[in-house]
């Protein structure tokens, strides 16, 4: 009687190390206990591929996928799934940022785009049972060639398939076999290279662990085609599980008459021995491997001697890697056409190197959500591998680079994400296929340090036989180490390139000629990082500790001494913490609430736990200062006579005014609105930024000597020439970008369509605003969420936000999204408006379409495409488009030479922020387009510095003045305190108490909580 369910437990190295055999034992015991052992079979399979999620269990025939199983999960799983027929969602895979688990294996993105040729038996058979392999057509290809094909026919089929070596060189397999057969001398040897030593690579090991018989069958077919009777598998001794299964497979094949003398009675004899290598990376090179097999030191020899003619013991020898051999039985069984129609092929010439047919196995590792082993068709793009299969970058961080081809492969940037992955295209851009390692790097990876790491690795693995490799790697390692320590000098990059070229031209083996790839590719694609290390003594990724001891401070656009103020909070010296913040930031209360905190993703603690709540601690220090009535006192410079006019009182304008005022300059700010603060005052609701906090900090700006004239519109009430005539020696434009852009759909002129500013401005000015009962907000920004949450507070019964992409791609802050959902706002993802329905010139509804993501736009995000026939109508009476804004430059004098971009922003010198009009500077959203408050403040500080130098008639130095580090003694913690530490949740006003009012939602950290959170800090500054 057949089993009704097969429970396939992954028993690859990754899952075994996570105790998958204990899970298997627990399953068998529980199944027997429940008297299900006649109905349910538990099978230990090879590697499933999704290595980071082990132990893995797949239940067939449904294909239900369970992950990260523990022994304690088993009784419940057996009862629910096997007895009651209810799969267990909590044990299923849930994609990052999503909340809905995916039950079936084939529906998980990691598996969706894979095509299994070499891994065709993955997760299906017990690798320790030859019977399982035979049941999957194992050894039928061998029988076919032995009894119905001549050796030349076998070689011809392999040639037609286009199979190229998967070990790194990519030489056409069929041509290699043919050359070896024609070498004329005997004996001939067949060798499998399983000496996989690349960092982060485990393709060959996993394939042997999962399906060793496919490799043995491929080798035996190859031996028949070549005319060999002896074969060797050269495998690392640190692969114990692969070795164990390989030994078992060879013994089983011999017992079945599939290896040894007179195989299957065919008169063909062939046997295989295992040779355990010592783990030298250079022995992955064919001639070094053969030297090691012979019992000599594993050193390569000159390539003009071909191993197919003079290889092992100077005899004709054919060497292919594990993956190449595993593909051979499939090509024989299913025909060369099956293999050749997958991938890319440039020509029909069978003797050509052109094209890359079939599939390739990659180990996908590094800064990626779904790490593991994948097999994909040649020609798939890097983007599909990294984002569709790999699930993108953890923590919402930005993709930076991917290294293909192992330690001597190239590092490719984001602009090459749409590159098809095949032998030729990778070589064209300075990388290579290699054996299939693929290491993904995010924005926190320093490309100079990456190059240094791989050069150091290769330096240690070089055999030292040839001077270019031995001395070249040593010299490059020394140069790269100096650069990462901040000791680089002009000419270092050029010297690296020169050494690299010498190695490429003259090194003895492929290790030496390819070793410069990490250096050359990072120089080619990330030259600016080398320049930053050498010229500016800065590591942009905040990795090199000699240059950037504290990533948090480095990431702060204002260069605030983060560990300094966090350290003071940890010691209970809150006034000192507030003083440190104010040294670089005139708006601690504002930024403590609405800063987008780029420092937190850089926090080193975030690599192993939650990052420090840096923004919340900033707010705590500011609130403490305000509660204690501490008035900030800033030192002012000597008075100066040159007057400065600032147009706009938003964050950029007020910041520039503050620092110019402290420098002694008379500053006047002209603001169109009746209140100061710009969009801080009229664009951000009180529940996020109370007016009391905003006004307190504006008063501190005024105290520095800044005059703010509200209700004055430049270009109408006063002109540019008036400002010049009134003696202003410099003008700073900081008018922002709040002119709404149209959706481009019909009905936008109807009553009930409101621009965000038409809603938020009167609300923030205390005026009454009426919205309908059913409101639709369009967009995925923080402003869109502000509009939705404001409409909710104004009494709208239903508020729906439409966003045309997925939740993972929504630009709004995650905390804002969750707060909106908690307040009852419905968010329709993958939805876009197509028409505003109008009746009697009023909004009567909104026609929408469902979207799907297909391809990519210029920003690198997936492009939303309407799904045909997916239209539906929302019953709404108010529509608020909040998709994008642009600056309004109508106040600028016509014909005065201001350069403007195609997107209506002002062109400025990036170093000085001076416009094309002498004496006129600009910063903030009017220059960048819609940005963050922190970015505007940073540009305001730079503008103040630039204007000050301009007024003194001096050139502004490119180097920023070095800022001091505050010496704060660390708090000593007990082991018990450390164990209890975790990031606190911000106390908030309950959702049911938010409706109908604009009370602040986030309540601030209590004193004890703030101190405890500050004590979690690793205090990276102390390692300087």
Where are these regions (language model features)?
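N-terminal Rossmann-like FAD-binding beta1-loop-alpha1 element of flavoenzymes
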Residues: 643-668, 784-792
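Feature captures the FAD/FMN-dependent oxidoreductase FAD-binding
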Residues: 643-647, 695-745, 835-847, 854-855, ...
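FAD-site-proximal beta/loop scaffold in flavoenzymes
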Residues: 749-773, 856-930, 934-935, 971-975
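A conserved FAD-binding loop/helix module that cradles the flavin
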Residues: 787, 923-957
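Ferredoxin-type iron-sulfur electron-transfer modules in oxidoreductases and energy-metabolism complexes
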Residues: 1-6, 18-43, 61-90, 141-158, ...
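Rossmann-like dinucleotide-binding cores of NAD(P)H-dependent redox enzymes
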Residues: 666-708, 763, 788-835, 955-970
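Glycine-rich dinucleotide-binding loop and its adjacent helix/turn
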Residues: 621-637, 696-716, 740-794, 900-916
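Hydrophobic alpha-helical positions that pack around
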Residues: 114, 243-378
């Amino acid at each position: 009687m057949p089993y009704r369910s097969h429970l396939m437990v992954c028993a690859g190295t990754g899952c075994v190390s996570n105790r998958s055999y204990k899970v298997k034992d627990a399953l068998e015991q529980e199944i027997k206990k429940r008297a299900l052992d006649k109905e349910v079979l538990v099978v230990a399979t090879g590697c499933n591929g999704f290595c980071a999620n082990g132990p893995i269990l797949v239940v067939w025939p449904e294909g239900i996928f369970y992950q990260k199983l523990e022994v304690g999960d088993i009784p419940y799983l057996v009862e629910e799934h096997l007895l009651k027929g209810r799969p267990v969602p909590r044990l299923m895979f849930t994609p990052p940022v999503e909340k809905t688990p995916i039950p079936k294996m084939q529906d998980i993105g990691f598996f969706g785009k894979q095509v299994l040729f070499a891994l065709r038996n993955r997760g299906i058979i017990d690798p320790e049972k030859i019977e399982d392999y035979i049941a999957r057509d194992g050894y039928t290809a061998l029988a076919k060639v032995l009894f119905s094909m001549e050796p030349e026919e076998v070689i011809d089929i392999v040639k037609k398939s286009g199979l190229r070596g998967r070990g790194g060189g990519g030489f056409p397999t069929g041509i290699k076999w043919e050359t070896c057969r024609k070498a004329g001398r005997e004996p001939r040897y067949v060798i499998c290279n399983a000496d996989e030593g690349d960092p982060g690579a485990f393709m060959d090991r996993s394939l042997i662990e999962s399906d060793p018989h496919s490799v043995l069958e491929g080798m035996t077919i190859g031996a028949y085609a070549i005319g060999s009777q002896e074969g060797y598998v050269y495998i690392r001794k640190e692969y114990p599980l692969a070795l164990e299964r390989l030994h078992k497979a060879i013994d089983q094949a011999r017992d079945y008459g599939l290896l040894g003398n007179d195989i299957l009675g065919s008169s063909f004899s062939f046997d295989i021995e295992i040779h355990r290598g010592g783990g030298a990376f250079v022995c992955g090179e064919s001639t070094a491997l053969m030297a090691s097999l012979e019992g000599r030191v594993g050193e390569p020899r000159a390539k003009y001697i071909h191993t197919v003619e003079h290889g092992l013991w100077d005899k004709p020898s054919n060497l292919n890697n594990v993956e190449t051999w595993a593909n051979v039985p499939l090509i024989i069984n299913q025909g060369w056409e099956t293999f050749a129609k997958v991938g890319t092929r440039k020509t029909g010439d069978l003797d050509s190197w052109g094209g890359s047919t079939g599939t390739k196995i990659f180990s996908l590792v590094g800064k990626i959500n779904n790490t593991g082993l994948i097999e994909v068709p040649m020609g798939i793009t890097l983007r599909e591998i990294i984002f569709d299969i790999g699930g993108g970058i953890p923590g919402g961080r930005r993709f930076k680079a991917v290294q293909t081809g192992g330690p001597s492969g190239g590092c490719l940037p984001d602009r090459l994400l749409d590159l098809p992955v095949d032998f030729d295209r990778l070589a064209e851009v300075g990388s290579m296929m290699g054996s299939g390692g693929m290491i993904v790097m995010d924005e926190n990876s320093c490309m100079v340090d990456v190059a240094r790491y791989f050069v150091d690795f290769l330096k240690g693995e070089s055999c030292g036989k040839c001077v270019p490799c031995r001395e070249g790697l040593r010299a490059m390692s020394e140069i790269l180490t100096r650069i990462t320590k901040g000791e680089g000098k002009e000419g270092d990059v050029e010297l690296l390139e020169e050494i690299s070229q010498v190695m490429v031209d003259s090194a003895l083996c492929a290790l030496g000629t390819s070793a410069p790839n990490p250096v050359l590719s990072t120089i080619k694609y990330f030259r600016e990082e080398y320049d930053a290390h050498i010229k500016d003594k800065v590591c942009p990724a905040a990795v090199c500790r000699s240059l950037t001891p504290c990533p948090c401070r480095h990431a702060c656009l204002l260069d605030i001494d983060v560990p300094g103020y966090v350290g003071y909070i940890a010691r209970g010296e809150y006034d000192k913490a507030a003083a440190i913040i104010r040294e670089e930031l005139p708006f601690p209360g504002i930024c403590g609430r609405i800063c987008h905190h780029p420092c937190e993703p850089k926090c080193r603690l975030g690599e192993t736990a939650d990052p420090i709540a840096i923004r919340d601690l900033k707010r705590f220090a500011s609130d403490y200062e305000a509660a204690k009535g501490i008035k900030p006192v800033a030192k002012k410079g000597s008075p100066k006579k040159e007057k400065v006019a600032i147009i706009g009182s938003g964050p950029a304008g007020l910041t520039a005014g503050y620092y110019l005022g402290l420098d002694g300059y008379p500053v006047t700010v002209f603001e169109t609105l009746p209140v100061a603060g710009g969009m801080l005052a009229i664009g951000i609701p009180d529940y996020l930024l109370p007016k009391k906090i905003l006004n307190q900090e504006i008063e501190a700006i005024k105290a520095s000597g800044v005059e703010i004239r509200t209700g004055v519109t430049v270009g109408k009430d006063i002109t540019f020439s008036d400002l010049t005539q009134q003696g202003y020696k410099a003008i700073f434009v900081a008018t922002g970008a709040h002119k709404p852009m149209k959706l481009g759909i019909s009905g936008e002129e109807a009553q009930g369509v409101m621009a965000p500013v038409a809603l938020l401005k009167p609300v923030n000015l205390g005026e009454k605003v009426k919205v309908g009962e059913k409101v639709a907000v369009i967009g995925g920004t923080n402003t869109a969420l502000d509009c939705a949450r404001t409409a909710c507070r104004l009494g709208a019964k239903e508020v729906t936000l439409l966003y045309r992409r997925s939740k993972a791609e929504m630009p709004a802050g995650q905390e804002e999204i969750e707060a909106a959902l908690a307040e009852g706002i419905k968010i329709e993802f993958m939805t876009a408006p197509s028409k505003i329905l109008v009746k009697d010139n009023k909004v009567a509804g909104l026609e929408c379409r469902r979207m799907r993501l297909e391809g990519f736009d210029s920003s690198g995000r997936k492009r939303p495409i309407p799904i045909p026939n997916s239209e539906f109508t929302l019953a709404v009476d108010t529509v608020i488009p909040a998709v994008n804004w642009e600056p309004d430059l109508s106040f600028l004098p016509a014909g005065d030479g201001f350069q403007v971009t195609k997107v209506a922003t002002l062109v400025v010198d990036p170093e000085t922020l001076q416009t094309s009009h002498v004496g006129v500077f600009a910063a903030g959203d009017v220059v960048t387009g819609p940005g963050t408050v922190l970015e505007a403040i940073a540009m305001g500080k730079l503008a103040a510095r630039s204007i000050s130098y301009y007024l003194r008639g001096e050139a502004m130095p490119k180097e920023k003045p070095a800022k001091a580090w505050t010496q704060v003694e660390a708090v000593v913690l007990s082991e018990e305190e450390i164990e209890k530490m975790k990031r606190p949740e911000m106390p908030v006003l309950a959702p049911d108490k938010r409706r109908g009012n604009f009370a602040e939602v986030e309540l601030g950290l209590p004193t004890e909580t703030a101190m405890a959170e500050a004590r979690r800090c690793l205090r990276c500054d102390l390692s300087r």
